[in-house]
Swiss-Prot record:
Belongs to the nematode receptor-like protein sra family. Residues 1-25, 83-108, 168-192, 265-278 are extracellular. This is Serpentine receptor class alpha-13. Expressed in the AWA and AWC chemosensory neurons. Residues 47-61, 130-146, 214-243, 300-335 are cytoplasmic. Disulfide bonds: none annotated.
Amino acid sequence: MAIISSVNRTCASESLLELYRSYKYILSTSFNIIIPIISLFFLVYAIKQLCAQSIIQYSTRVLLITTILFAVCHQIAYFCFKADLLYTMLFKLDQPCNLQHSSYDCRFITIATTTSNCGMALVQLAMSIDRVFALKFNRVYYKLKSIPGITLALITLSISFSMFFILTIDDPLSGYVNHCGFYPTYSQDKFHIFLDVTLYLAVFNFVFDIGLMYYSYQEILWKRSYSFVNRFQSRISLKCTQAIFIISICQCISNVLYSGLLSLLMKLGRYMSSADYNLSLSLAYTTPYSCLILPILICKVLEYIKKQRTVGILSLRNQKQSMEGHMAMINSAWK
């Protein structure tokens, strides 16, 4: 059985010490430290790109930046606990009975990772809601500019930051864990429920985004106008929806992997040794890699939209359509 936490401080098992002495695990932990450093560069670059892009609607831009800020928060916390783990493996193995950390000492890292994982999951839902506003209330949405995004971002931030305190409301944080990557001793059942809810939310977002993408395409075709400005705004709305769809789908898959694998690992932990559990955890925790892929994906999507905008402007300027052709297009959109 994997001893990952305890009520009182316990000495490290021989198998865990052997794992900590393993060059493979040391190299793996060192690699895990490099990942957040590299990702922070791309995350900052993605924020600069979003601030410079006028093609992305204001509200959508706010939510994308919010997602990136959650990712930055996570990567900083992840770097801190991995660096502490590496320090333990290199310099503290001669104190096997002092390797564990109290849940209280790990509280800041746990708050940061819980807030970030919850926030990135909720922002996907917020971006889908934002797209619904953009499609159903197009004129009002354009007038409000960034207000819908700011409102949704504040709600998401409030829920995400409160999540740790809700999950540990009756936890004195007096237990001990092998390192700060583990959940508090007395709250593991609640965190397990949190992972299940995250999984269900990711699946819901996945299905909702597919339906929203189909609806948005039909809605744009129906609302096409002879006015160049209206047609251009429709194209912009559709391209933004496509961008959010691509990013949301990738994030949903990431959330499914993160919550599903961790939930499975927590169930199987009682049948595993501490060494096997630690190795499995380093593989199952996919969020750091998602935070690395996220800014790269955003930059690629922005580049694609920029190219499509140029093509769209040229096609709209050259487009000539009769009344019969316009009605045929509307009829085909609803078949």
